[in-house]
């Protein structure tokens, strides 16, 4: 099961740049749910952690924490959602893949809502692919 979850993390990373839109407005939290008070704090902490692999893909900073089955995506300065951090944790239960997502977006509400919608769609496509194949 651990190997499949790691494969899912790699798979999520491969889809990070083919985002699409959905209609539902995202729910908002009153405080950060990513474990850090700010996007900058999260990025600095993850970059300092030797167990986490950090790479830049198409301007996005991607931090992969295989031990905790977590993939972080940080928007580039060129993106309307900058600065933002998307934290996704992959779980497998009863042969079903689940993605738990938390977002901290410090940009405008419309840009943040759009970012969340894009990642929700991405997560849905990834889950469908992992359940049913390409």
Description of each model-found segment:
Residues 22-81:
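N-terminal secretory signal peptides
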Residues 86-96, 122-123:
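A short, surface-exposed beta-strand/turn
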Residues 81-87, 98-100, 113:
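Short, surface-exposed coil-to-beta transition loops
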Residues 104-134:
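C-terminal partner/receptor-binding element of secreted or periplasmic proteins
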Residues 69, 95-99:
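Residues at beta-strand starts and edge strands
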Residues 9-16:
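Bacterial N-terminal signal peptides
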Residues 66, 75-78, 90-91, 101-107, ...:
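A mature extracytoplasmic/lumenal domain signature
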Residues 1-9:
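Bacterial N-terminal signal peptides that target proteins for export
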